[in-house]
């Protein structure tokens, strides 16, 4: 049976991604000075303005307006004619401390209050919720092909803009990839969509030629392209007005781009701007770590892990797996392996993955999972032998 599946990505200059990067830049700046800082930082951008809000509890000072301007400059919004630039945009801040009602459950979990002696029981989950992790073996990074290629296209768009290969490009852009499957195996790419902001002086024909030559052909495996592959490059014909001038942006509004492109389920919680006591982030990273190690160990060809937590409780209230008919062993056995190999209490996740450090801004564009350009601890295949010994 044949079917099509599509995923999208966006560049670092997309309005929502600007917000994610600002929120994570603030988080990184605080963790660099205060590894135990509590951060929930939200950002909104619109024409000529940035608003940073949230709850931050820390013993250090960070210059948020300076962080905002430096982040916008690094993305590439440096000229007024782009409709948004780092020097002239207004930066507003409204920051308060973390609610003491939340802090009391995070600082000391219910297990600890009831006399638990295990040091990893001390920190309770920062909220309730469910988080999903996914991995499959259709790419070398154990990611679905559509989102993997879409991210690489978006990253390449920024590369050719910043290195001067295509100097007329501007920071905003989006990509989309449709993969055709036969009997659940990726066999070809059916459609590629690239929309990129550009200067008014360049023709659509030139953009199409350059994007195909310098972006698509440099990224997409040629063996997955054929004469029937569809290419849509700036299909509206013009994309001069973009970034926050074209659309307002918010932190946490690209959660499917951030994860598996819709191929795996999502619990609904965003990542950027959140310190690792927030299980929306740390447990989603842990779930990916679990799923990737299990697939790499040969437990299944596709595997999705769900973790669920209650606020103030250290241990997950549930762990479940789905192998989509590809499992080599029973799902109940897989859950047993997870419980034996992985400690999924927030304190243990933070310790094992070394999450109290400034590593987050680099995740805020081009995906949090399956990255080949940066090293991320939840992508480590460091549990393979333990898993194989239990299969």
From Swiss-Prot:
CC annotations in GO: cytoplasm
Keyword RNA-binding: no
Cofactor: how bound: Binds 2 divalent ions per subunit.
Main location: cytoplasm
Pathway assigned to this chain's UniProt record: Amino-acid biosynthesis; S-adenosyl-L-methionine biosynthesis; S-adenosyl-L-methionine from L-methionine: step 1/1
Record key words, sorted: ATP-binding, Cytoplasm, Magnesium, Metal-binding, Nucleotide-binding, One-carbon metabolism, Potassium, Transferase
Location(s), subcellular: Cytoplasm
Chain intervals for the UniProt region annotation (Flexible loop): 98-108
Subunit structure: Homotetramer; dimer of dimers.
Function of the molecule: Catalyzes the formation of S-adenosylmethionine (AdoMet) from methionine and ATP. The overall synthetic reaction is composed of two sequential steps, AdoMet formation and the subsequent tripolyphosphate hydrolysis which occurs prior to release of AdoMet from the enzyme.
Cross-referenced PANTHER family: S-ADENOSYLMETHIONINE SYNTHETASE
Family: Belongs to the AdoMet synthase family.
Protein name per Swiss-Prot or TrEMBL: S-adenosylmethionine synthase
Encoding gene per record: metK
């Amino acid at each position: 049976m044949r079917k099509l599946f599509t995923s999208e990505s966006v560049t670092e200059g997309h309005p929502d991604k600007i917000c994610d990067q600002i929120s994570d830049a603030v988080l990184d700046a605080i963790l660099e000075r205060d590894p135990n800082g509590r951060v929930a930082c939200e950002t909104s951008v619109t024409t000529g303005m940035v608003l940073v809000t949230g709850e931050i509890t820390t013993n250090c000072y960070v210059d948020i307006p300076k962080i905002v301007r430096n982040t916008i400059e690094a993305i590439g919004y440096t000229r007024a004619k782009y409709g948004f630039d780092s020097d002239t945009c207004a930066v507003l801040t409204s920051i308060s401390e973390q609610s003491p009602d939340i802090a009391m459950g995070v600082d000391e979990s219910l297990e600890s209050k009831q006399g638990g002696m295990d040091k990893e029981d001390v920190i309770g989950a920062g909220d309730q919720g469910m988080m999903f992790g996914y991995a499959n073996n259709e790419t070398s990074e154990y990611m679905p092909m559509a989102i993997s290629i879409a991210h690489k296209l978006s990253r390449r768009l920024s590369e050719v803009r910043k290195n001067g290969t295509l100097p007329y490009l501007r920071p905003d852009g989006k990509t989309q990839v449709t993969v055709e499957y036969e009997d659940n195996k990726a066999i070809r790419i059916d459609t590629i969509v690239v929309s990129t902001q550009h200067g008014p002086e360049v023709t659509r024909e030139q953009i199409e030629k350059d994007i195909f030559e310098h972006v698509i052909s440099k990224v997409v495996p040629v063996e997955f392209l054929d004469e029937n592959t569809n290419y849509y490059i700036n299909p509206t014909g013009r994309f001069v007005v973009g970034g926050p001038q074209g659309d307002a942006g918010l932190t946490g509004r690209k959660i499917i781009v951030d994860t598996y492109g819709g191929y795996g389920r999502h619990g609904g919680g965003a990542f950027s701007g959140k310190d690792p006591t927030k299980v929306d982030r740390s447990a989603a990273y842990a779930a990916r770590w679990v799923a990737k190690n299990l697939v790499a160990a040969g437990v299944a060809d596709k595997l999705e892990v769900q973790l669920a937590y209650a606020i103030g409780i250290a241990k997950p209230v549930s762990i479940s797996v789905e192998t989509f008919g590809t499992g080599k062993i029973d799902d109940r056995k897989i859950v047993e392996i997870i419980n034996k190999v992985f400690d999924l209490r927030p304190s243990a996740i933070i310790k094992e993955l070394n999450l109290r450090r400034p590593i987050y801004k680099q995740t805020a564009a081009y995906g949090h999972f399956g990255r080949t350009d940066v090293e991320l601890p939840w992508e480590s295949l460091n549990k393979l032998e333990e898993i194989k010994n239990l299969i």
